[in-house]
Amino acid sequence: MTNLRKTHPLMKIINSSFIDLPAPSNISSWWNFGSLLGVCLIIQILTGLFLAMHYTSDTMTAFSSVTHICRDVNYGWLIRYLHANGASMFFICLFLHVGRGLYYGSYMYLETWNIGVLLLFAVMATAFMGYVLPWGQMSFWGATVITNLLSAIPYIGSDLVEWIWGGFSVDKATLTRFFAFHFILPFIIAALAGVHLLFLHETGSNNPSGLSSDADKIPFHPYYTIKDILGVLLLILVLTSLVLFSPDLLGDPDNYTPANPLNTPPHIKPEWYFLFAYAILRSIPNKLGGVLALVLSILILAVIPLLHTSKQRSMMFRPFSQCLFWILVADLLTLTWIGGQPVEHPYIIIGQLASILYFLLILVIMPITSLLENNLLKW
C-alpha cells in the first residue's frame, strides 16, 4: 500500500513541500530565516487576533482599550508585547533573509525574488498601519507625516491624501480603515508567502556555493526540519527574553502619551526598522525627491538581478564583492542610526553621504567590481 502522505491530495502538497522535498546538502543556517519568517507570521496573526478581540478602533477609546488589554485582560500585557516585539523579530529575520539572498545570489530566481520584494512592501505597510493603532503621540504624528508624503505626488497628491485620511486630517475614519487593512493584510501576506514557496520549489533552493546542487540532494525531513526547529527555539528564546525583561526597549516613550493633534512631539520618528528609509527620505531637501528616494531605497531590490554582472552566482568566492557587501551593511546601520537622530549638524551631512553611498554601491560600484573580478579570473 502506498503511503497516505504521497497519495492524499492535501497531504501530498505538504509532503512535497516539507517532507520529501529534495534540498541541497550544504545549505547553512542563513537558510533558516524563511521558516523563521513563517513562524513570525503565525505568531503575529495569532497574537493580533486576540488583541483584536479587545481593541476598539475609535479615536476616543483606542488608547484606553490598549491600556485595558495590558491591565485587565488575562495575560493581555503578554499578548500585546509579543505582538509589538514580534514585529521587531519579523523585521530582523526579513533583513537577514534579504541579506542572505543578496550575498548568495538567490535573486537569480526572478519570480521568487520579485514576490519577496512584494512581500517586503506588504509587511512594511502592515507594520506602519499597526503602529498607528494604539493612538499614542508617535502613532498619530507618524501617520500624519508619512501619509502627508503622498501630497508630493503632482496634480493628484492632496486629493489622494484626503481620500486616504477620509477627511481633512488623520482622524476616526483613518484609524478605522487602518485597523481594517492591518487585519486583512497578514492573510494576504500568508497567501503571497505560499506563492513565494511555490516558485521556490519550481527551481529548488540555492546554496552557499551558488553552483547546481542537483548531484547532491538530501530529503528535507528529518535533516532540515530538525535544523529549523533549532532556529525556531532560538527565535522564541530571543523574543520571550525581550518581552519578559525589556518589552519597551525598541518602542518610543512618546507613544505612552495619548494622541494630541495640538501638540507635536519634538522628534517624530518611526519604529527602528524604518529608520534607514526615513534617513534617506530626510537627506533630500526636496519633498518629491525625498519620497522617490524613499520608495526607490526598497524598490531597488527589484532591479538587482539586472545588475548582476559576475560570472559567479554567489559572493562566496569573490572577496572584493564581499568587502562591498559588508560596507553596504555598515552603511545601512549608519542610516538606521541617523534616522533616529535630530535634523542638525553633523547628522544631516552624514545622512546625505550614507544615502548617496547606498545607491552608488548597489547601482555602480558593485556591478563594476563584479566585472573586475571576472577579468582577474580571466573569465
Swiss-Prot record:
Localization in the cell: Mitochondrion inner membrane
Record InterPro entries: Cyt_b/b6_C, Cyt_b/b6_C_sf, Cyt_b/b6_N, Cytb/b6-like_sf, Cytochrome_b, Cytochrome_b_C_euk/bac, Cytochrome_b_N_euk/bac, Di-haem_cyt_TM
Which UniProt keywords are given for this protein, alphabetically ordered? Electron transport, Heme, Iron, Membrane, Metal-binding, Mitochondrion, Mitochondrion inner membrane, Respiratory chain, Transmembrane, Transmembrane helix, Transport, Ubiquinone
Short name of one Pfam family: Cytochrom_B_C
Which residues does heme b b562 bind?
Answer: 83, 182
Q: Which sequence ranges are marked TM in the entry? A: 33-53, 77-98, 113-133, 178-198, 226-246, 288-308, 320-340, 347-367
The cofactor required is: heme b
Q: What's in the GO CC field?
A: mitochondrial inner membrane; respiratory chain complex III
Residues binding a ubiquinone are: 201
One GO MF term, please? Answer: metal ion binding
Q: Name one GO biological process term.
A: mitochondrial electron transport, ubiquinol to cytochrome c
Residues that hold heme b b566 according to the record: 97, 196
The entry's free-text remark on the cofactor is: Binds 2 heme b groups non-covalently.
| Topology in membrane | Multi-pass membrane protein
Query: For this UniProt entry, which residues form the secretion signal?
Result: none
Quaternary structure? Answer: The cytochrome bc1 complex contains 11 subunits: 3 respiratory subunits (MT-CYB, CYC1 and UQCRFS1), 2 core proteins (UQCRC1 and UQCRC2) and 6 low-molecular weight proteins (UQCRH/QCR6, UQCRB/QCR7, UQCRQ/QCR8, UQCR10/QCR9, UQCR11/QCR10 and a cleavage product of UQCRFS1). This cytochrome bc1 complex then forms a dimer.
Instruction: Supply any other comment.
Output: Heme 1 (or BL or b562) is low-potential and absorbs at about 562 nm, and heme 2 (or BH or b566) is high-potential and absorbs at about 566 nm.
Q: Which family does it belong to?
A: Belongs to the cytochrome b family.
Q: What is this protein's function per UniProt?
A: Component of the ubiquinol-cytochrome c reductase complex (complex III or cytochrome b-c1 complex) that is part of the mitochondrial respiratory chain. The b-c1 complex mediates electron transfer from ubiquinol to cytochrome c. Contributes to the generation of a proton gradient across the mitochondrial membrane that is then used for ATP synthesis.
- What protein is this chain from? Cytochrome b
- Give the species: Sorex cylindricauda
